[in-house]
């Protein structure tokens, strides 16, 4: 059991028949009454975000999440196929399960598949990915203010803002957390 006083961002817990990841938390000590911990939790099965308040010192059950290193192979209609690098066992996940991750997934990419008691509950991408620009308008030279950007589409179909010097065929490093341009590879 873990005390709510020991909460950390990213901690996974089992509360109310659900698996939750702590997104944010705050220890509150009111002038009158006992202290409590206000937390924001994400349900790892549904993706729903919920705010929950715990009494200070309350105990919660930790959720033992197993991370398996897997390789993304291909999409088969609405199903996406991953292969375990050690056992060569293949796992299929539905497309709606990978809503945000699909923007950055390409064949042969290494990802972490998160499982809880044999059930797949999440896919963790690397912090950054390298994707090739397939479409962008040419940059216009002239007197532009610093930080001028244009729109570019990468090989997965994801569209983002990039600096004017980026051309079609360039390989970009993209942050998977917020989908922003980091640099050219």
UniProtKB/Swiss-Prot annotation:
Coiled-coil annotated spans: none
Cell compartment(s), UniProt: Cytoplasm
GO biological process annotation, one example: peptide biosynthetic process
Gene3D superfamilies cross-referenced by the UniProt entry: 2.30.30.30, Nucleic acid-binding proteins
Keyword match Transport: no
Alphabetized PROSITE patterns for the sequence: EFP (PS01275)
Gene Ontology MF terms in the entry: translation elongation factor activity
Domain of life: Bacteria
Function recorded in the entry: Involved in peptide bond synthesis. Stimulates efficient translation and peptide-bond synthesis on native or reconstituted 70S ribosomes in vitro. Probably functions indirectly by altering the affinity of the ribosome for aminoacyl-tRNA, thus increasing their reactivity as acceptors for peptidyl transferase.
PANTHER family for the chain: ELONGATION FACTOR P, ELONGATION FACTOR P (EF-P) FAMILY PROTEIN
Name the record gives this protein: Elongation factor P
